[in-house]
Each structure stands twice: as structure tokens, then as C-alpha cells.
Amino acid sequence: MSRHSRRMRILCLCATTLLMAGSALASEAGGHADGQLKDFLYRLLDFGITFGALYFLLRGPLKRALSARRQRVAEALEQARQMQASAERRFAACRQQLADADAQIAQLTADLKAESALQCQRIEEQARKMADDIRSEATRSAAREIEAARKQLHQEAVRLAMELAEQRLKQQIAPQDQARLVDEYLRKTGE
């Protein structure tokens, strides 16, 4: 508060006190009829002075208090607007994320289907390759078995042919031919 303002307040307070004292003195006039009007005017004057003094004294603080209150209300409203705007932005972001999530789910589903189809194709290719390998191995194994069976049949045929030839030779060779063949063999081996 400034010095001038303080002096004015003190001056108003003193004037109010004097006027109130004047009203108190004026109200002691006895029961005259015109005293009521005078009393009413003093009271009206007293009220006006009191109201004026209060207005003068309280105008500044009341104005500051109301101004501060108005400022707080304005700040609270601004803060509420900011909070509402922030909430609306978050809501819009959440809505966008939800929309994006639907799109991402659709994309993931499509990717998984494509990956699944690719995986199935790889598995089919591997199965075909394994089947081809098994067929190839079976063919080689069968060829080996057939070759082994041919050799065995050939050996058996040779053995049977030799037995048959031996039996025929035994039937056709006489003991003297046998002695002659042995002698020829010994001569050939001895040389």
C-alpha cells in the first residue's frame, strides 16, 4: 500500500467515527414529531458515509481479490481447456492406434498365410526330393540285387555246366583216355 492510500483510509475512518458520533448526539432529541425525519436523514447520512467509507477502503482490496479470483477462474478454465485438448489428442491417438492395430492384424494375418503357403511349398519340395531320393536309392538297390542275383545265377549256371560236363566226360572218357590226359597235363605243367 502506498503512503497516500494509507492516509486516506485513516482520514476516512476518522470522518466516519465523527459522523457516527454526530448521529448518536442527534438522536437524543426527545419525542418531537419532526425528530423522526431528522433521525431518518441522519441515519441515511450515516449509512451513506459508512457505505462510502467502506467503498473507499475496500474498493482496492476487493477489486484485487475479485481480480485475483477472476484470474484463478480464467487459469482454471484454460487448464481445463488444455486438459480437454490433451485428452482429445490422446483419444484420437488411441483411436488411430486401434485403426492401425486392425490394419496391422490384417497385415500379420496375410503375412502368416503367405509364410504358411511358402512353408507348405518347401515341405512339399522336400518331400518330393526325399521321395525321388528313396526311389533312386531303391532303383540302385534293386539294380545291385539284380546284378548280385545274375552273378549268383551265372555262378550256379557255370557250376551246373561244369557238373554236367564232368558227368558227360565221365561217361565218354574211358580209363585209358584219362591216363593220357593226366600225362599231357603233367608234361605241360612240368615244362
From Swiss-Prot:
Membrane spanning residue stretches: 7-25
One GO cellular component, as annotated: plasma membrane
One of the Pfam families matching this protein, by short name: ATP-synt_B
Topology in the lipid bilayer: Single-pass membrane protein
Predominant location: membrane
Keyword DNA-binding: no
Compartment(s) where it occurs, according to its Swiss-Prot or TrEMBL record: Cell inner membrane
Cited function: F(1)F(0) ATP synthase produces ATP from ADP in the presence of a proton or sodium gradient. F-type ATPases consist of two structural domains, F(1) containing the extramembraneous catalytic core and F(0) containing the membrane proton channel, linked together by a central stalk and a peripheral stalk. During catalysis, ATP synthesis in the catalytic domain of F(1) is coupled via a rotary mechanism of the central stalk subunits to proton translocation. Component of the F(0) channel, it forms part of the peripheral stalk, linking F(1) to F(0).
Membership in a protein family: Belongs to the ATPase B chain family.
Protein name, as recorded: ATP synthase subunit b 1
Species classification: Bacteria, Pseudomonadati, Thermodesulfobacteriota, Desulfuromonadia, Desulfuromonadales
